[in-house]
Structure formats: structure tokens, C-alpha cells
């Protein structure tokens, strides 16, 4: 998405980042925040206006030097948790209670971490399996965005999440 946005909007109007804030889409234009998280955005010359806007809106903002690491870290977590919860129709924490689901979640986390390594991206954690399990535990009652999409008959992010990993991985086979 980052590259597409730059092509269409220009580098000065795009910032790479990630957030740890969860949310539930309640309806068109209506979202319920799932707790206070952090918005991490890569620091670059054009970030000033965006930084001011986010801070004035009282978002918890962190400027970082390597947002790519955070984006891929989030990709590891999302690819390990979201598709499984959507397929099984269960909240995040239940992945830890089902041995076969936990095994697949671990394999997915390792696979995405391997692709990140092939892309020369340093993840923000050393153990992708532990990171995915920690997030599943911390968000045990949450229903992933992909599960929410399935339940309301909306398109999912399967291509944006898993497809991104497949496309990156194909470059290294």
C-alpha cells in the first residue's frame, strides 16, 4: 500500500507507519476503539503537519527511524492470527487453547518472519512465535478484523495480509 500511495500522492504526502490500536467497525463511519495504542510513524522531512495534527488530536504518537520493521512485525502477528480466527470463527485467545490452531499459528508466524529475513527486514522482536502468542493472549477476547469482515459479509484483508507475504516470498524462490 505504501508504494501505491507514493505513486498516487507523492512522497511528501505519505508516511509509513503502524498502530497498535484495535478497533471494531460498528457501521459506516462508526468505529469503537479497542483500547489506547500507539501510532508509530517513520520520521521524514514532510511529517511535520501530520505530526502536529495527530498530537493535537491527542493520539499517542511515536516517531521512529525504521517503520518498515514495525510494519513487518505487525504483518507477522496479523498473518498468524487473523486468517485462523476468521476460518475457525473464534476470538484471538482461543487459538492458544486449541493445539492444532496454535501449531498453525506458530508456523505462520515463522513463515512470515522467514520472508521478512529474506527481504532484509529486521523485526521488532526476536521470537515471532512468542510475539504472536503474546498478542493472542493480550487480545484474547477480541475478534480479529478479518473475522469481523467475514461475519458482516465484507471483503477481507486476506490479500493485503497473506498476499503481501506471498508476493514478497516469491521474489526469493
What are these regions (language model features)?
Residues 55, 106-173:
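NAD(P)-dependent Rossmann-like dehydrogenase/reductase catalytic/cofactor-binding core
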Residues 68-114, 140-141:
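Active-site-proximal catalytic alpha-helix in oxidoreductases
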Residues 1-30:
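Rossmann-like NAD(P)(H) cofactor-binding subdomain of soluble oxidoreductases
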Residues 18, 35, 65:
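Residues at the C-termini of beta-strands that transition into short coil/loop
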Residues 29-51:
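Short beta-strand and adjoining strand-loop segment in the mid-core
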Residues 10, 31-35, 79-80:
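Short, hinge-like loop/turn segments at secondary-structure boundaries
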Residues 48-82, 130-131:
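FAD/FMN-dependent oxidoreductases across multiple families
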